[in-house]
């Protein structure tokens, strides 16, 4: 041991001693464990000690301290490990034993919420060692080390052994294991060397009776650890040294420590883990961890509070016929019909789940679910609060979300024609309401103000078609929050009183969640007050500054995003959300921002589809699990027309998959949101995906993002000698992409002959991309001859199928040169003007330009008046004939806006309008950010 200088003893077990030591060779601190001197002469214990070291050395996991070295030469038997600063789980538990009052810091450290992630890490480590065939056999708080920097490691592998190993039998034979009387087992918290392997207090009953160890014995020990974490007490209430029968009743955690507010099912998990009969325990660590997942993920536990029978009047406070128009005046369908109205006798909590099934026929004329504030409900003002209206027409289910009589969200979806009954689930929390139909999310709304109502109302015509209504309550809702008082003032629109109490709570709980939550709600209160009473909404921004850099830092940016959203500053809203998501990616409040993104997606689909694609991209990038498979299909339908109008989707005939890099690139292209392009480029390069790299270059170039284009060009040049793409991608080389990049640069520098020579060395797809990137600028700069020359050079050697892709450019040049005969022939032959010609297609707009060249303005307006989408791109281009369209552009996505400006410019040139008119559109196009050919 000359290499090591012992500093001090830091731990002692049944077989070994652990010292803090200085490693002279490496000049570092290590933990050195050696066999106890009084046991060093025992050959069997010496063998077990070395087995411990070798087992630990073979296991590689964050929850296991790695072994640096093992020494068994001569009398010295020891091994070394990294020294981890921290404390044992036992010392943390011991710090709160028999204490009636805990400090805020200690209360937080020993809360159920804080302990569960620690326990899950312990379980993950044990799950790993079980997968390697190892049993620990001495799991206890003493052997769990909590590092100062979040480490959770299992130590002391002296009792560990491989399952089914010969040593199990040898221990029973050679160690003369003691026979135990099951009626009178004396528990101990210390491992007994040479007698029994493990610590009796944490050993399963069958182990104390001499039964061979198994995974179930480790699960039992973990159950005892979980029990102590939940209760801060050991399950056996006994005086030290008293003998105890293991058949004695063990109180469930929820009864042992009622003040700890332990969810009943979590209590049951602990009891199942420490069941006397091994068959009654969890079958594996994996099953135990799965049972804990809802609590680790923050999912609420629901217990049924009441069951309401639709036809049983005793379940309802009010049960009367009513006119629908009084409750849902905004509905277009049959508002004058009479319906049954029922108001629940029972009040519902802040977190409530409503579940029922209903027949399709019962909602043919519609049915409503209301969440009403009690005060208004008592006065008979049933139009206040939130309402959901369900109706089925022609196999299509429509759900409307209504607030205070105003429809704020609506969604329709086709149902299975044979389906006669469907299940509806509504989850309501302080600030969130979610509607699920057949387990698929249908509507999500977040208010950020706890005012969703606490009485349930039902409006329906056909009572026979509705099942009983199950009202479940979240366990978390049983706690009365200190925020309830200001929340109540807020729900009554008593903003000043609410603000006073929010400030008091903020100042009373510094550094705690209650404090930053109160400040966040204070900011939302002031924002709502300004919005209702009139004023500058940006005044509310300073309220969220208070959260800067604190425990609730992400909420600063969520609050500011709300201000910008209500102020109509979409770009600033996105900046705030992105900053929080990037800077605080591991913060506990980030799921709240992810929920907000999800809400904004659905909200913008209803109000501003131009914004929806941005939120779709952000969710795909940050929280793709938030979107269900059924929602994927819906979103793919929404973007179908844009997909058909996207060049790199036309070139690649493979279907666009929603959860794919190509979808992320597609959304980046349409939204002009280029933040994720570098990562997409890195990902495509790593996969050697030639087509993806080409698509990314195209998107960066055609979007005008010169900086990204050149950045990718430099990155590609650095690996041009190293990479050859696989044969499955036609063995395309990086050199072809480099020719493309240099060719595009030559086009930008107006060196057209050089560009042609470089692009000649590239495949048709890259030539097409270069052509598309160049054609807009050629028309804007009125350098058509150069474009025609490049177009002809690409056109001549191509196949018939490839020529279809560049036909549009040829027609454009004919229209520009006022060659009506050639333009008409190509248009009529390939894109006949009939009802099947889609308004979103390029050919539809080119027909409008052709009609403009004929001088028939009436025909032009008649052509564009066919558009079904009044504020779509084609319809807006038609509007520019008689007036400006700039006020309508906000309804369009970024790329749609650019193309609308260009095509309006092109149409006005064809109409032979004055330069003053078409120049406005040209300048507006050029002024849009990231124009590549500036």
Swiss-Prot record:
SMART domains tied to this protein: S_TKc (SM00220)
Extract the SUPFAM superfamilies matched here.
Protein kinase-like (PK-like)
- Sequence ranges assigned to domain Protein kinase in this UniProt record: 4-296
Q: Which reaction does it catalyse?
A: L-seryl-[protein] + ATP = O-phospho-L-seryl-[protein] + ADP + H(+); L-threonyl-[protein] + ATP = O-phospho-L-threonyl-[protein] + ADP + H(+)
Molecular function terms in GO for this entry?
ATP binding; protein serine kinase activity; protein serine/threonine kinase activity
Q: Does the keyword Ion transport apply?
A: no
Is the keyword Transferase in the record? Answer: yes
Modification comment: Autophosphorylated on serine and threonine residues.
- What does the UniProt keyword field contain? ATP-binding, Kinase, Nucleotide-binding, Phosphoprotein, Serine/threonine-protein kinase, Transferase
| Domain of life of the organism encoding this protein | Bacteria
* Broad class of enzyme this protein falls into: transferase
- Enzyme nomenclature, EC number: 2.7.11.1
- Record-listed ATP binding positions: 10-18, 33
Q: Where is the active site?
A: 138
A Pfam family matched in the record: Pkinase
Q: What does the sequence similarity comment in the record state about its family?
A: Belongs to the protein kinase superfamily. Ser/Thr protein kinase family.
Q: Which PANTHER family match?
A: MITOGEN-ACTIVATED PROTEIN KINASE KINASE KINASE 20-RELATED, SERINE_THREONINE-PROTEIN KINASE YBDM-RELATED
Role according to the record: Together with the serine/threonine kinase Pkn1, may play a role in the specific interactions with host proteins during intracellular growth.
This one is known as Serine/threonine-protein kinase PknD
Q: Which organism is it from?
A: Chlamydia trachomatis serovar A (strain ATCC VR-571B / DSM 19440 / HAR-13)
């Amino acid at each position: 041991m000359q290499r090591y200088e012992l500093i001090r003893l830091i731990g002692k077990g049944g077989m070994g001693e652990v010292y803090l030591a200085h490693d002279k060779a490496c000049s570092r601190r290590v933990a050195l464990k050696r066999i106890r001197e009084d046991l060093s002469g025992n050959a069997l214990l010496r063998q077990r000690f070395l087995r411990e070291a070798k087992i630990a050395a073979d296991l590689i996991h964050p929850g296991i301290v790695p072994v640096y070295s093992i020494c068994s030469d001569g009398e010295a038997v020891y091994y070394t490990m990294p020294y981890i600063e921290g404390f044992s789980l036992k010392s943390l538990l011991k710090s709160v034993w028999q204490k009636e009052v805990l400090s805020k810091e200690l209360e937080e450290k020993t809360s159920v919420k804080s302990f569960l992630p620690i326990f899950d890490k312990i379980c993950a480590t044990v799950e790993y060692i079980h997968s390697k065939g190892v049993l620990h056999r001495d799991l206890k708080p003493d052997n769990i080390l909590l590092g100062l920097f979040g480490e959770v490691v299992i130590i002391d592998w002296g009792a560990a052994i491989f399952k089914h190993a010969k040593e199990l039998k040898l221990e029973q034979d050679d160690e003369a294991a003691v026979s135990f009387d099951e009626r009178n087992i004396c528990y101990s918290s210390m491992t007994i060397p040479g007698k029994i392997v493990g610590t009796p207090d944490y050993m399963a009953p069958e182990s104390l009776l001499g039964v061979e160890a198994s995974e179930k014995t480790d699960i039992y020990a973990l159950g005892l650890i979980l029990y102590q974490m939940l209760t801060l007490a050991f399950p056996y209430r006994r005086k030290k040294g008293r003998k105890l029968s293991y058949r004695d009743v063990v109180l469930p955690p929820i009864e042992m420590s009622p003040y700890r507010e332990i969810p009943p099912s979590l209590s049951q998990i602990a009891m199942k883990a420490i069941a006397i009969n091994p068959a009654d325990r969890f079958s594996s660590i994996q099953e135990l961890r799965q049972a804990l997942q809802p609590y680790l993920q923050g999912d609420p536990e629901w217990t049924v509070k009441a069951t309401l029978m639709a036809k049983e009047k005793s379940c309802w406070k009010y049960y009367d016929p009513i006119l629908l128009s009084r409750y849902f005046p905004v509905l277009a369908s049959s508002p004058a019909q009479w319906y049954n109205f029922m108001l629940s006798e029972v009040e519902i909590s802040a977190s409530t789940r409503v579940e029922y099934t209903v027949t399709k026929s019962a909602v043919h004329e519609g049915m409503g679910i209301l969440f009403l504030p009690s005060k208004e409900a008592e006065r008979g003002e049933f139009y206040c609060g939130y309402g959901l209206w369900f109706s089925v027409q022609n196999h299509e289910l429509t759900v409307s979300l209504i607030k205070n009589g105003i429809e704020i969200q609506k969604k329709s979806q086709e149902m299975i024609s044979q389906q006669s009954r469907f299940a509806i689930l509504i989850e309501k929390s302080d600030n969130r309401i979610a509607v699920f139909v057949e387990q698929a999310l249908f509507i999500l709304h977040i208010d950020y103000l706890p005012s969703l109502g606490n009485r349930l109302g039902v409006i329906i015509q056909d009572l026979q078609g509705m099942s009983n209504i199950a009202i479940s309550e979240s366990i978390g809702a049983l706690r009365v929050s200190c925020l309830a008082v200001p929340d109540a003032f807020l729900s009554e629109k008593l903003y000043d009183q609410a603000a006073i109490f929010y400030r008091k709570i903020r100042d009373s709980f510094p550094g705690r969640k209650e404090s930053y939550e109160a400040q966040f709600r204070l900011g939302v209160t002031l924002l709502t007050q300004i919005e209702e009473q009139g004023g500058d909404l940006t005044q509310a921004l300073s309220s969220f500054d208070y959260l800067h850099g604190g425990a609730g830092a992400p909420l600063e940016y969520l609050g500011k995003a709300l201000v910008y959203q209500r102020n109509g500053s979409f770009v600033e809203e996105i900046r705030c959300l992105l900053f929080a998501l990037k800077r605080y990616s591991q913060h506990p409040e980030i799921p709240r921002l992810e929920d907000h993104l999800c809400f904004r997606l659905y909200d913008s689909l209803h109000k501003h589809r131009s914004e929806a694609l941005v939120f779709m991209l952000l969710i795909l990038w940050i929280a793709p699990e938030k979107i269900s498979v059924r929602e994927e299909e819906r979103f793919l339908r929404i973007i179908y027309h844009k997909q058909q109008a996207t060049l790199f989707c036309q070139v690649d005939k493979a279907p666009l998959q929603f959860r794919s890099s190509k979808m992320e690139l597609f959304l980046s292209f349409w939204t002009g949101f280029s933040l994720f392009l570098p990562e997409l480029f890195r990902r495509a390069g790593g996969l050697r995906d030639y087509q993806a790299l080409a698509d990314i270059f195209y998107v960066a170039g055609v979007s005008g993002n010169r900086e990204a284009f050149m950045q990718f060009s430099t990155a590609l040049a650095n690996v041009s000698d190293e990479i050859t793409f696989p044969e499955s991608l036609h063995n395309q080389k990086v050199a072809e992409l480099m020719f493309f990049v240099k060719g595009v640069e030559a086009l930008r520098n107006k060196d057209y002959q050089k560009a042609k020579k470089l692009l000649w060395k590239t495949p048709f797809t890259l030539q097409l991309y270069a052509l598309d990137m160049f054609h807009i600028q050629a028309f804007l700069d009125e350098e058509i001859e150069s474009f025609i020359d490049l177009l002809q050079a690409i056109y001549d050697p191509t196949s018939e199928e490839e020529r279809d892709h560049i036909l549009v450019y040829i027609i454009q040049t004919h229209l520009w040169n006022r060659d009506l005969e050639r333009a008409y022939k190509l248009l009529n032959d390939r894109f006949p003007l009939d009802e099947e010609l889609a308004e979103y297609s390029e050919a539809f707009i080119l027909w409008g330009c052709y009609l403009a060249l004929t001088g028939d303005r009436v025909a032009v307006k008649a052509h564009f008046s066919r558009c079904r989408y009044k504020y779509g791109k084609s319809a807006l281009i038609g509007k520019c004939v008689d007036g400006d369209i700039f006020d309508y552009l906000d309804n369009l996505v970024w790329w749609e806006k650019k193309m609308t400006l260009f095509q309006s410019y092109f149409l006005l040139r064809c109409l032979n309008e004055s330069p003053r008119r078409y120049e406005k559109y040209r300048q507006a196009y050029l002024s849009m950010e990231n124009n590549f050919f500036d």
